[in-house]
Amino acid sequence: MSITAEEKARLIKEYATKEGDTGSPEVQIAILSSRIATLTEHFKSHKKDNHSRRGLLMMVAQRRKLLDYVKGKDEARYQKLISSLGLRR
């Protein structure tokens, strides 16, 4: 249910704004999106797993907050991020 260290390192490298950047909103949103996609696949075969569903909803809320933050800071950065991640907004 979690992402591998290699996948996480790839996401950090792809979305980092500078070398060694692991905490920028872009990196956090990319990692959360990957975890959300993994959990969504999990729910296709485990429909009654409500404990994990709560975790999924918390991750979605956290990603929404981070996306709102980026949108408030820089609209162009926000548009670039959601298009590269394939999010719907």
From Swiss-Prot:
Coiled-coil region(s): none
Any GO BP annotation: translation
GO molecular function: rRNA binding; structural constituent of ribosome
A Pfam family this chain is assigned to: Ribosomal_S15
Keyword RNA-binding: yes
GO cellular component, one term: cytosolic small ribosomal subunit
Highest taxon of source: Bacteria
Keyword DNA-binding among UniProt keywords: no
Keyword terms of this UniProt record: Ribonucleoprotein, Ribosomal protein, RNA-binding, rRNA-binding
Gene3D superfamilies (UniProt xref): 6.10.250.3130, S15/NS1, RNA-binding
InterPro entries, sorted: Ribosomal_uS15, Ribosomal_uS15_bac-type, uS15_NS1_RNA-bd_sf
PANTHER family referenced in this protein's UniProt entry, alphabetically: RIBOSOMAL PROTEIN S15, BACTERIAL AND ORGANELLAR, SMALL RIBOSOMAL SUBUNIT PROTEIN US15M
Complexes and interactors: Part of the 30S ribosomal subunit. Forms a bridge to the 50S subunit in the 70S ribosome, contacting the 23S rRNA.
Family of this protein: Belongs to the universal ribosomal protein uS15 family.
Record function comment: One of the primary rRNA binding proteins, it binds directly to 16S rRNA where it helps nucleate assembly of the platform of the 30S subunit by binding and bridging several RNA helices of the 16S rRNA.
Entry protein name: Small ribosomal subunit protein uS15
Record gene name: rpsO
